[in-house]
From Swiss-Prot:
It comes from the Eukaryota. O-glycosylated; contains heparan sulfate and/or chondroitin sulfate. Cleaved intracellularly by a furin-like convertase to generate 2 subunits, alpha and beta, which remain associated through disulfide bonds and are associated with the cell surface via the GPI-anchor. This processing is essential for its role in inhibition of hedgehog signaling. A second proteolytic event may result in cleavage of the protein on the cell surface, separating it from the GPI-anchor and leading to its shedding from the cell surface. Keywords: Cell membrane, Disease variant, Disulfide bond, Glycoprotein, GPI-anchor, Heparan sulfate, Lipoprotein, Membrane, Phosphoprotein, Protease inhibitor, Proteoglycan, Pyrrolidone carboxylic acid, Signal. Glycans are attached at N124, N241, N418, S495, S509. The record marks R358, S359 as: Cleavage. One of its GO terms (molecular function) is peptidyl-dipeptidase inhibitor activity. Cell surface proteoglycan. Negatively regulates the hedgehog signaling pathway when attached via the GPI-anchor to the cell surface by competing with the hedgehog receptor PTC1 for binding to hedgehog proteins. Binding to the hedgehog protein SHH triggers internalization of the complex by endocytosis and its subsequent lysosomal degradation. Positively regulates the canonical Wnt signaling pathway by binding to the Wnt receptor Frizzled and stimulating the binding of the Frizzled receptor to Wnt ligands. Positively regulates the non-canonical Wnt signaling pathway. PROSITE patterns: GLYPICAN. The lineage of its organism: Eukaryota, Metazoa, Chordata, Craniata, Vertebrata. This is Glypican-3. Heterodimer; disulfide-linked. Cleavage by a furin-like convertase results in production of alpha and beta chains which form a disulfide-linked heterodimer. Interacts with DPP4. Interacts with FGF2. Interacts with WNT5A. Also interacts with WNT3A and WNT7B. Interacts with hedgehog protein SHH; the heparan sulfate chains are not required for the interaction. Also interacts with hedgehog protein IHH. Interacts with CD81. Interacts with Wnt receptors FZD4, FZD7 and FZD8; the heparan sulfate chains are required for the interaction.
C-alpha cells in the first residue's frame, strides 16, 4: 500500500512539474492586445524576451500556429513550444508507466534472488546428505555438488549450458569416488588411474540405474520453466523502457504544439484543449505504440498460463529441494548391486586381479539426518508460488495498458472534459463536435500532420521480441487435465505419491521416505545444522564457475534474511534514482 502511495505521489509531482497551458481555472479572458501575458509565460520556458513581440504581429513565418489575424508568437517561439510539447509528452508517458515498471523491476529482482536462494538451499541439502551418510566421499563430493549447482545457477541466468551434460558430469565425477571409497575401500593406490574407465563404465553399465535420466528430466523441465519466467519478466522491463523513451515525430510535435500552446499566440492563456480533440491527437501520436497492445495482452495471459503450471516437476523448488534424496537413492542402487558391478568393471577396466573386494556395510538407520531438514516456522508464510500468483494478478490489471494510453494521457493533462468552451487547435469554440478516432493507425482520424505510416523501427523490434517470448511461454506452458497426469507418471511420479502443493514426499521408494517442506517460505530461511560455507574442505574448493556465477549475482550469505531485505530496498531506491 505504501509503495502505491509513493508511486502516486511521484506521478502527481511529475505532472505538476509539466508546463501545460490552461492549468488555472478562471474563464478565458479576452485576447491580450499587448502580448504581456504571453511574454510572462514564455519567459518560464526560455529566459529572455528577445523572441517575443511586444505587440501582435502578422506571423507570416509561422508554420504550426497559423494565425487568422495578428499573433503574439514568432517562429523561434513556435520552435520552443514544439520542443516543450514533445518533452511534456515523453514525461507523461513515463509517468503513466511508472507503477507498472516498478512492479516488474521489483519482482524480477526478487524472484532472481529467491531462485538463487533455492539453489543454495538445495546445495546445502545435498552436501548435508553426503556428510551424514557418506562422510568418506567428502570433500570430493562437495566439489562435484558445488560445480553442479553453479551450473544450475548459470543456466537460470541464461548461460548456454546443457542440462543433460550437467547431470552426466555430476554422476561421471561421483562414480569413481563411490567405486574407490564405498565399493572398494581397500583399492591400492596403483589402481587409482582407472577414473576415465570408470566414467565410461558408469554410462555403459547404467550403474546408477534410471536415476540420472530421472534427474535430467525433472531438472530440465523445472529449470527451463524458471529460466523462461525470468526472461519474460526481463523482457517486460525492456518493453516498458522502450516505450518510455520513444522520441515522438515532428508531425506529432506539431499537433501537440497546436493543442497545448497555439492558443497562447492569440492571448488565450487560460483556455483548455477540448477533450475529444486531445483524444484524436493522442491516438495519432501513439498509433504505433498502441500496436503493441495485442502482443502485450498475449504476453500477460501467456505468463499467467506458465505460472499456473509451475508445480511438481515444473517447479524448481520441488525438484531441487528433493534432489538430495534422489541422489541418495541412486547411491543406494549402486551399493545394492556392488558385487555384480565390481566383477563386471574389474574385467572391463582390467584391474580385478590387483584388488581384494571388500564391501562396505551401511545400516538403514544412517539414511537422512532429519535434524538437517528442520524448517523455521513463520507465521503468515508466503511461498514463491503465492508470490508468482500475486504478481500475475497485479499484471492483469495492466493488461489494457497500451490501448488505454491515449485516454490516460488526456485524463492526466489539462483538457475541457465536457468539450465546452475549449480550444480545438485553431480557435476557441463553444462545443467540440468532432468524434474521436478509434485506436490504431489504420483507423485513426485523418489529420494532415500525422502521416499514415507503420510503427517506429524500435517499436517493431519490441513487438518481434514479444512475439518470440509469447511463443516460448506457450511452448513451456503445462499440458492440462489427464495429459498432465500422464506426463508426470511417465517422469517417475506414480499415483499415490505425495501431491500436496506445499508439502511433498522427498525421497525415493522404500522405508527411507521422509516428509519435508519442499517450498521455501518467502523471505524466510531454513535452519541448518550444516553451513556449507563452513563444511570441511569446502572453503578451498572454489572453482572458476563459482567465480563466474559471483559476477552474475552476488547474494552474500544465504543464511542472512537481512541481506535479502537490504538488497530489495537498494533495488527500490536505485529505481527511483533512475526515474529522477
Amino acid at each position: 500500500m505504501a509503495g502505491t502511495v509513493r508511486t502516486a505521489c511521484l506521478v502527481v509531482a511529475m505532472l505538476l512539474s509539466l508546463d501545460f497551458p490552461g492549468q488555472a481555472q478562471p474563464p478565458p479572458p479576452p485576447p491580450d492586445a499587448t502580448c504581456h501575458q504571453v511574454r510572462s509565460f514564455f519567459q518560464r520556458l526560455q529566459p529572455g524576451l528577445k523572441w517575443v513581440p511586444e505587440t501582435p504581429v502578422p506571423g507570416s513565418d509561422l508554420q504550426v500556429c497559423l494565425p487568422k489575424g495578428p499573433t503574439c508568437c514568432s517562429r523561434k517561439m513556435e520552435e520552443k513550444y514544439q520542443l516543450t510539447a514533445r518533452l511534456n509528452m515523453e514525461q507523461l508517458l513515463q509517468s503513466a508507466s511508472m507503477e507498472l515498471k516498478f512492479l516488474i523491476i521489483q519482482n524480477a529482482a526478487v524472484f532472481q534472488e529467491a531462485f538463487e536462494i533455492v539453489v543454495r538451499h538445495a546445495k546445502n541439502y545435498t552436501n548435508a546428505m553426503f556428510k551424514n551418510n557418506y562422510p568418506s566421499l567428502t570433500p570430493q563430493a562437495f566439489e562435484f555438488v558445488g560445480e553442479f549447482f553453479t551450473d544450475v545457477s548459470l543456466y537460470i541466468l541464461g548461460s548456454d549450458i546443457n542440462v543433460d551434460d550437467m547431470v552426466n558430469e555430476l554422476f561421471d565425477s561421483l562414480f569413481p569416488v563411490i567405486y574407490t571409497q564405498l565399493m572398494n575401500p581397500g583399492l591400492p593406490d596403483s589402481a587409482l588411474d582407472i577414473n576415465e574407465c570408470l566414467r565410461g563404465a558408469r554410462r555403459d553399465l547404467k550403474v546408477f540405474g534410471n536415476f540420472p535420466k530421472l534427474i535430467m528430466t525433472q531438472v530440465s523441465k523445472s529449470l527451463q520453466v524458471t529460466r523462461i519466467f525470468l526472461q519474460a519478466l526481463n523482457l517486460g522491463i525492456e518493453v516498458i523502457n522502450t516505450t518510455d523513451h520513444l522520441k515522438f515525430s515532428k508531425d506529432c510535435g506539431r499537433m501537440l504544439t497546436r493543442m497545448w500552446y497555439c492558443s497562447y499566440c492569440q492571448g488565450l492563456m487560460m483556455v483548455k484543449p477540448c477533450g475529444g480533440y486531445c483524444n484524436v491527437v493522442m491516438q495519432g501520436c501513439m498509433a504505433g505504440v498502441v500496436e503493441i497492445d495485442k502482443y502485450w495482452r498475449e504476453y500477460i495471459l501467456s505468463l499467467e498460463e506458465l505460472v499456473n503450471g509451475m508445480y511438481r516437476i515444473y517447479d524448481m523448488e520441488n525438484v531441487l529441494l528433493g534432489l538430495f534424496s534422489t541422489i541418495h537413492d541412486s547411491i543406494q542402487y549402486v551399493q545394492k548391486n556392488a558385487g555384480k558391478l565390481t566383477t563386471t568393471i574389474g574385467k572391463l577396466c582390467a584391474h580385478s586381479q590387483q584388488r581384494q573386494y571388500r564391501s562396505a556395510y551401511y545400516p538403514e538407520d544412517l539414511f537422512i539426518d532429519k535434524k538437517v531438514l528442520k524448517v523455521a516456522h513463520v507465521e503468515h508464510e508466503e511461498t514463491l508460488s503465492s508470490r508468482r500468483r500475486e504478481l500475475i494478478q497485479k499484471l492483469k490489471s495492466f493488461i489494457s495498458f497500451y490501448s488505454a494510453l491515449p485516454g490516460y494521457i488526456c485524463s492526466h493533462s489539462p483538457v475541457a472534459e465536457n468539450d465546452t468552451l475549449c480550444w480545438n487547435g485553431q480557435e476557441l469554440v463553444e462545443r467540440y463536435s468532432q468524434k474521436a478516432a478509434r485506436n490504431g493507425m489504420k483507423n485513426q482520424f485523418n489529420l494532415h500532420e500525422l502521416k499514415m505510416k507503420g510503427p517506429e523501427p524500435v517499436v517493431s523490434q519490441i513487438i518481434d521480441k514479444l512475439k518470440h517470448i509469447n511463443q516460448l511461454l506457450r511452448t513451456m506452458s503445462m499440458p492440462k487435465g489427464r495429459v498432465l497426469d500422464k506426463n508426470l507418471d511417465e517422469e517417475g511420479f506414480e499415483s499415490g505419491d505425495c501431491g500436496d502443493d506445499e508439502d511433498e514426499c522427498i525421497g525415493g521408494s522404500g522405508d527411507g521416505m521422509i516428509k519435508v517442506k519442499n517450498q521455501l517460505r518467502f523471505l524466510a530461511e531454513l535452519a541448518y545444522d550444516l553451513d556449507v560455507d563452513d563444511a570441511p574442505g569446502n572453503s578451498q574448493q572454489a572453482t572458476p564457475k563459482d567465480n563466474e556465477i559471483s559476477t552474475f549475482h552476488n547474494l552474500g550469505n544465504v543464511h542472512s534474511p537481512l541481506k535479502l531485505l537490504t538488497s530489495m530496498a537498494i533495488s527500490v531506491v536505485c529505481f527511483f534514482f533512475l526515474v529522477h
